[in-house]
Regions:
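Active-site catalytic microenvironments in core metabolic enzymes, especially phosphate/sugar-handling
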Residues: 1-255
Length: 255
């Protein structure tokens, strides 16, 4: 299948024009190659997994490897990955905030997996787009919800902070929730599920009597891989897909 056809499929659901101005979603490494037979999917592209790229034609990640621009190509991990992809004729595409803001992404994943009702975007961009999801859940304790989140995202660890005795209204902010703590306090859900919070963020949610479940950033968005795989399988024929779920937390030891 042609690379432009694959990109067209992805952008028909997650248009890159909806990315944030600071983001680098879209085609990042474009080469003369047109035919795509094997695609590599991952949330992040890690140097530890570079050997897995040897026979792929295209890499699609959630987080863009090239984010704020490049001033030099040296011997750091990102530069080595860039050189490897160019040398091996590998097309590289990222769907980051263009993916985040659509209801068919993480919004639908968490809504379906947790059987949420009365849902809406946690942080609205407009009536049709936004970040995360708020919704109601039935008959699940806070601790059990933590186990469910750990299982559906294949997370290595989960932190659970019980700050009240309710667990009906949830606010889920996949990825970093640090910029949206004030939104959460204003919304007043029973429980917030997110990642990348600092000391004062956790303290503020405790003072607001809002339960908190923290997972690592990568795990909170691991569903990206399966969502993109499902889309590609539905709209393409004969393309081999390699899924990678490596995370920066793989080397973390819980003691």
């Amino acid at each position: 299948m042609k690379k432009n056809e694959i990109i067209k499929i992805i952008e028909s659901i997650f248009p890159k024009e909806y990315r944030e101005p600071w983001d680098n979603s879209g085609l990042i490494i474009d080469l003369d190659k047109e035919d795509i037979k094997k695609i590599y999917l991952s949330v992040d592209l890690l140097y530890d997994d570079i050997k897995e790229l040897d026979d792929v034609d295209m890499v699609i990640t959630h987080h863009p490897l090239i984010f704020k621009g490049i001033k030099e190509i040296d011997m750091n991990a990102s530069s080595k990955l860039i050189k490897h992809m160019i040398k091996n004729d590998i097309i590289y595409y990222s769907a980051h905030t263009s993916f985040d803001v659509q209801s068919s992404g993480f919004y639908k994943f968490y809504k379906d997996k947790l059987k949420l009702s009365n849902t809406d975007f946690a942080i609205k961009v407009n009536d049709d787009r936004g970040y995360g999801v708020v919704g109601d859940i039935k008959d699940v304790s806070l601790k059990d919800l933590g186990y469910i989140i750990k299982e559906i995202n294949n997370a290595k660890y989960i932190q659970v902070y019980k700050n009240n005795n309710r667990n009906s209204r949830l606010m889920i902010l996949n990825g970093s929730g640090r910029d949206f703590v004030e939104n959460a306090i204003e919304e007043r859900p029973d429980t917030v599920i997110t990642s990348d919070l600092g000391y004062h963020d956790i303290q503020a949610l405790r003072n607001a009597k809002i339960n908190l479940i923290i997972q690592d950033h990568n795990s909170s968005e691991s569903a990206f891989v399966n969502i993109i795989e499902d889309i590609l399988k539905k709209h393409t024929n004969g393309i081999e897909i390699v899924k990678n779920f490596s995370s920066f937390t793989d080397n973390v030891e819980i003691i």
